[in-house]
Amino acid sequence: MARVTVEDCLENVDNRFELVMVASKRARQLATGGEDAKVPLEGDKVTVVALREIAENLINAKNVDQQKRPLHEF
């Protein structure tokens, strides 16, 4: 379980506000089953997984809204 820092994530998003918005949207997608994680879960909570995805530049502000949503959100 690698530690994720805000600085790691800020290399891939514009500012802290955007980081919070992207991470919260992605964590909700993961928690509700809308999309599979793009990194190994390793027993981490969905918020940590979301931050790891952002730090590895797998999720960003442009593509977080393009991820699949569960049917109950329509």
Curated annotation (Swiss-Prot):
Q: Gene3D superfamilies under this entry? A: 3.90.940.10
Q: Which domain of life is it from?
A: Bacteria
Q: Name one GO biological process term.
A: DNA-templated transcription
EC number annotated for this UniProt entry? 2.7.7.6
Q: Which cellular component terms (GO) are annotated to the entry?
A: DNA-directed RNA polymerase complex
Top-tier EC class: transferase
Record's SMART domains?
Answer: RNA_pol_Rpb6
Named from the GO MF annotations, one term is: DNA binding
Q: Which Pfam families match?
A: RNA_pol_Rpb6 (PF01192)
Provide the catalytic activity annotation: RNA(n) + a ribonucleoside 5'-triphosphate = RNA(n+1) + diphosphate
Key words, A-Z: DNA-directed RNA polymerase, Nucleotidyltransferase, Transcription, Transferase
Q: Which family does it belong to?
A: Belongs to the RNA polymerase subunit omega family.
State how it assembles.
The RNAP catalytic core consists of 2 alpha, 1 beta, 1 beta' and 1 omega subunit. When a sigma factor is associated with the core the holoenzyme is formed, which can initiate transcription.
Instruction: Give the function comment from the record.
Output: Promotes RNA polymerase assembly. Latches the N- and C-terminal regions of the beta' subunit thereby facilitating its interaction with the beta and alpha subunits.
What name appears for this protein in its UniProt entry? DNA-directed RNA polymerase subunit omega
Origin species: Marinomonas sp. (strain MWYL1)
